Each structure stands twice: as C-alpha cells, then as structure tokens.
Amino acid sequence: PQTAPADADPETLRAYFAKGINHVPLTDERGHLVALAMDEQDVLRIGKHTISEDSPAFIIAEIGNNHQGSVDFAKELVDLAVESGADAVKFQLRDMDALYRQRGAATAGEDLGVQYTLDLLSRFSLSVDQMYEVFDHVKQHDMDIMCTPWDAPSVQALVDYGIQGMKIASADLTNHELLRDVASRGLPMLVSTGMSREEEIRESVALLRNAGASYALLQCQSAYPAPFKDVNLAYMDRLAEIGQCLVGYSGHERGYHVPIAAVARGAKIIEKHFTTDKTLEGNDHTVSLLPEEFKAMVQQIREVEAAIGSAAPREVSTGELMNRVNLAKSLVATRHIAKGEVVTEADVAVKSPGRGLQPNHLPQLVGRTMQRDVEEGSFFFEGDLKDDLVTRRDFKFDRPWGLPVRYHDYKPLIEEAKPDFLEFH
C-alpha cells in the first residue's frame, strides 16, 4: 500500500486523494504505522460512479430475494431495472448454515416469524454459483453491482467475485464482526441504520472510521410497509453529522414520493425494492416498485435535482428574459427632451414594457444632461447614464447579413440597420 510520512503536509496528502486514494497510512521513520489520513471530502466511489454532494443521486434497484430463487427471473429483473434507469442493482447473499443457529427440525422451537423467514430463504435464496451467473448478466449491461452479505462466507464469496460494493443491512449494524470483515476488504460500504438506537449508530460509525472504511449511512425505517409518520427524513441531517459522510435513504414505505423528498433533503443514495408483481410471496414485494413506478421515480428524482440548482448568485434565466421584457417596466420620457437639457423627475414616467432603463435607475437619471434627443414616450437606456455617447457607425459586408429578432422589435431594426434578412425567435 502507498504510505506517507507522519509529518506529511496537507498538500502532499491532497495529491494522494486526487488519485482516488481515500485513506493513506502515515508512518514514522522506522516504517511503523502511527496514524491514518482520510479524505474529508464526501466522496464515495462505487463501480463507475463517483458519489458526492455535487453528483446526481445514486439510485439502486434492490432486487434482494425478489427473484423467488430463479436465476432466469433474477436476470429478467436486472433487464427491467436497466430499462427503468437504475444506476445499480443489489442482491442479498446468505450462507444458511453460517447464518442461523438451528436448521431442520430444530427450527420448530423458533418464533413463527423466524420460521416463516427461514422457509422463504430456504426456497428463494440463490447459491453462490447462481449469484455469480446473475452478476455476469449484470456486467453485460455495464451496470454497477452491489450485494448485501449476511455472514462471513458470503463476504468472502463476494470478494472472490470482485463485487463493486457491499451493503450492510440494518439487522447487522451492531454485528461488529461483520462490519470489521467488510471494512477490511477496502470496498465501499452502504450502511443502513434501521432498527437501531443512536448510540448503536455512533458505536458502529466509530468502528468504521477506525477501520478506515469508505462508507455512507442510509436512513431507514425497517417496517414493512413503513408508516409515513415514522420515516423521519429529517434524521438524515443528524446521520451526516454523526457519520461525517454522505447520507442516503433506503425506503420500505409504499409509493415513491418519499425517496423523491429524500433527494430534495440531500440524500445522495436511494435504494428501493424492485419487483414485477407486488402479490408474489415474500416480505419485500408489497413495498417494492414495479418497473414503470421505478422509472417514474428515477425521472422525477432527476427533475427535482435539476430544480434544486445551486446557491450561486442569481442570474436571469433564458426563459425569464422574454417575460422580463414583456412584463417589467422601464423609464420613459413624458415629453420631448432635447440634447443638452437636464432631466427632471417630471420628465420621467414608469411604464411597460421592460425594454429600456429599469425604474431603480431613476435617481441616477434625474439631474443628468442628455447627450441625445429623446422623443416623448421613448425609452431611456443605460447609455443615458454615461457621459460618452455611443455614436452610430455604418458597416459594409461583402456577403448577405442578418439579425435575430423578435416580433416587437423587427420594424425599427429594419429601418435603422437595413439587414438583408431577419431570423425570428
């Protein structure tokens, strides 16, 4: 791994970060690790996507186990997710023997909900080889792949394949052994925070930071479906503060308006379950989106992102310019003012349209000596606030020339400029 001296200056470290290295070991003169420098820029790189505060939201179609244990159905869902505009698809991988403490007849002693879950998983889980086959199909679409490992063997299987990123389920937020295992692999991590208390979130964040993990936290309400009153998108702000990282939203509510609102509140990662039939057997189908719903969500998220814009100084948009002319007001002369006369307040009125000098310039106009004749009802212009008058010049061209014009101003332009042609807008 690349290292830097313990006394490396910020510029040296920034050069590492500019190369896409998020964590740089700092060593003393004996080569011993003494600290870890981390890129404080909120950037997460998953596959071909770089996720940051300035990037579009990274939208994940969570297929999970909605493939019903069928490789062909899983591939179909991938194809539909691609058509729906997802940036990535995500699956779940479990080693049932490593994950559950009891199997077979011994599960009779478990809670009914656990028995139901075990039954579904035993019927609908894909093997490692089957999952690899589905991953290969995803690669044909040049789409990013993520997966949730539920146990150590699954982590290793995903690493062996070359997975681009891993998701930690809410149920494993306090599974520090799994967190350390995934963090040690150097892969980007998305960590859901459902079913957790804040002190548990803080504890896991401390573990991830100490491990040098590259991660984002997802606000999540782990109920199926999640009541809207419990979603609490505002908590994303607190997660960003706790994690000092990018935040996102993993939704289990019905519909897709909440993820759109999450993006408006700053979520840079969105995860929603994906299915073709909400009546299929399994916990996730009822809170999943159909392909046409997912596509609508993606489109509306992109529209909202475009509408959010930036906090840069405001400028008049192209669409506003015409309305500014048509609806705004200008300073106009109430009488004929001859060149050399001093403009008084009585000489000026405020009238539409907004083709001339704006009304807020009235104080600068009053008291000025006119450098030109102004007819009654004519506009004043910015040039009337300057001492040097722009003089007319006649140009000659050796080819036909024209002007882009609007309907309301083409007549005076024809009379004054005499172009060979006009282009109407």
Listing of model-derived features with the role each one plays in the protein:
Residues 1, 14, 18, 414-422:
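Compositionally biased, intrinsically disordered low-complexity regions enriched
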Residues 1, 7-13, 116, 197, ...:
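Short, structural beta-strand-to-alpha-helix junction motif
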Residues 2-22, 26-28:
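The conserved cystathionine-beta-synthase
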